[in-house]
UniProtKB/Swiss-Prot annotation:
GO terms for cellular component: mitochondrion. Keywords: Mitochondrion. This is Uncharacterized protein C824.03c, mitochondrial. Gene3D superfamilies: 3.40.1350.10. The keyword Mitochondrion applies. GO terms for molecular function: endonuclease activity; nucleic acid binding. It is found in: Mitochondrion. It comes from Schizosaccharomyces pombe (strain 972 / ATCC 24843) (Fission yeast). Pfam families: RRG7. Its main location: mitochondrion. One of its GO terms (biological process) is double-strand break repair. The keyword Iron-sulfur does not apply.
């Protein structure tokens, strides 16, 4: 069992409060995963220029997408988060090794992601154990300078890109440095030439919440992530065995 520092404890408390509030079904304050936040948005109907809604939606989307790749994460973003939006662990079912601690910084920025964001993630990791994996999850592309900053960092880091179109949201880029490779020597990525299960499948089409409402909510992120061609999804592979779900 590993001991977590203050950042993990802060997130744990946040999650506990959310679970308590969830029982009240007060959608103005109740959300702790992608589905509950989409329900919240369907009531609030925020403007597509609402950056807070954009950022929060992307954090929950990253949480959902990375869960398909064996990351168990909880959201702790907000005031005083130190640049960390999700915390948790990476563990592979039926594989006996100690779960790896993970912190994730999510950037829904439009445009390229430069080295400043990688350095900010490095700074955020300073209050966590040295074997904690830091992931920078983004909509935009990484510059060559950001990839160089990743490669020379002395902390285990990974860069991840997410594609969003409302029905299919998935990871299509995942790169890590030598420090991360030392932790996961048998882990690799592989392209798959088929789309993962539709993200829309996770939303219950009951009560007043319809699939049409769900898809329209992703307009908050679509203009930021639209590309000319749909990128090829990735899966994670451990010792030649695919460990990603729904792919």
């Amino acid at each position: 069992m590993w001991i977590l520092k203050s950042g993990f404890n802060r997130c744990r408390n946040f999650s506990f409060m959310n679970r308590g509030l969830l029982g009240l079904r007060n959608l103005s304050v109740t959300h702790n995963n992608l589905v509950s936040y989409l329900e919240h948005l369907s009531v609030q109907k925020p403007s597509t220029s609402n950056t807070v809604a954009q950022g929060t939606l992307f954090e929950y989307l990253v949480q959902y997408v990375l869960k398909q790749h064996s990351f168990q994460l909880e959201r702790c973003g907000g005031k005083g988060d130190g640049g960390v939006d999700l915390v948790g662990q990476f563990s592979i079912k039926n594989v006996l090794f100690e779960p790896t601690k993970v912190v994730v910084s999510c950037k829904s920025n439009k445009g390229s992601i430069g080295p400043r964001f990688v350095r900010e993630l490095e700074g955020s990791l300073s209050s966590y154990p040295t074997d904690t994996l830091g992931i920078l999850a983004c909509l935009g592309s990484f510059t060559s300078s950001s990839l160089k900053t990743l490669s020379i960092s002395n902390r285990p880091l990974a860069l991840c890109r997410i594609y969003v179109d409302g029905f299919h949201s998935y990871m299509f880029q995942f790169v890590w440095n030598h420090q991360a490779l030392a932790i996961f020597p048998d882990l690799s990525v592989r392209q798959i030439y088929k789309l993962p299960s539709p993200t829309a499948n996770i939303v219950p089409l009951s009560q007043e919440f319809s699939q049409v409402n769900y898809v329209s909510l992703f307009e908050l992120l679509q203009p930021l992530s639209r590309t000319e061609e749909r990128p090829v999804p990735l899966v994670l592979v451990y010792k030649n065995q695919k460990i990603s779900l729904n792919c």
